[in-house]
Amino acid sequence: MFRISRLGWVWVGCLAVLTIIGCLRSEITIAADGGLFSMGLIWCAILLGMILSMRRSPLRAFAVPLECLAQLIAVSVICAVLQYPAAKIARPLIDAELAAIDRALYFDWPACFAWVLRHPMVLNLLSGIYLSLGLQSALSCFGAWRQPDRASIWLSANALSLTCCLTVFVIWPAGGAFAYYQPAGIFSDYLEQFVAVRSGSLTTLAIGQMKGIIQFPSYHAAAAVLLGYAFASLPRWIAIPAFNIEIMLSISAAPIGGHHCGGSGFLDSGIS
């Protein structure tokens, strides 16, 4: 556990340095507001709890889950910031190519999206599951009580997946299906930020306002595979429902997240 964990922290440190360099080069600043202060305070409290738990025998069982949670928060926030300098590189978009892959696979994104809109129950279900990624990730850290090595492997794989998503995003950026098909009456706040940062008009970021602007590949689809692995070691009455939720999380990436289906699906499986 601890060897893999140390590797994860080294990776987090490298990503943090890369984020600082990226923000300086792209002239993007992070607003020192209440959101940043609160996030830092929560993270420090978790880290302090981990240290205290390691020093007291009755509380030692809490140390590993708290370390996993601290590492998860660190890599998530750092990569959330890093996506903005990555987007500002502004290479040509590949949405037309991704849409062509969808057509070759006989996947009609506008028809799929319209069908989901016509079925409110499906829309609410997929939206809820799509938005549950953060909560699911946090809960998976507490699986470290049962199998600490498995939790540490999932965290390291998660950090690597985020890094791969960022790398692909820099080389082959995409605005996503919402930008390409422009469905009537649909407003996407992630798309507004994506366009703003590529044009250079977005130069200040607040932690509470950051969105997931990476549309290719889909991190949600990749995370569904990793979370399935994380929950697989738990009792069957937890693992089986969790497995079904991860399937729906992967499905929700297209109609809820606005991701192109074909290209993202194959690449995400490879990344995971």
Residue ranges with predicted function:
Residues 2-42, 62-139:
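N-terminal transmembrane-helix/juxtamembrane module of multi-pass inner/ER membrane proteins
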Residues 176, 215, 247-271:
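Interfacial helix-loop-helix junctions of multi-pass membrane proteins
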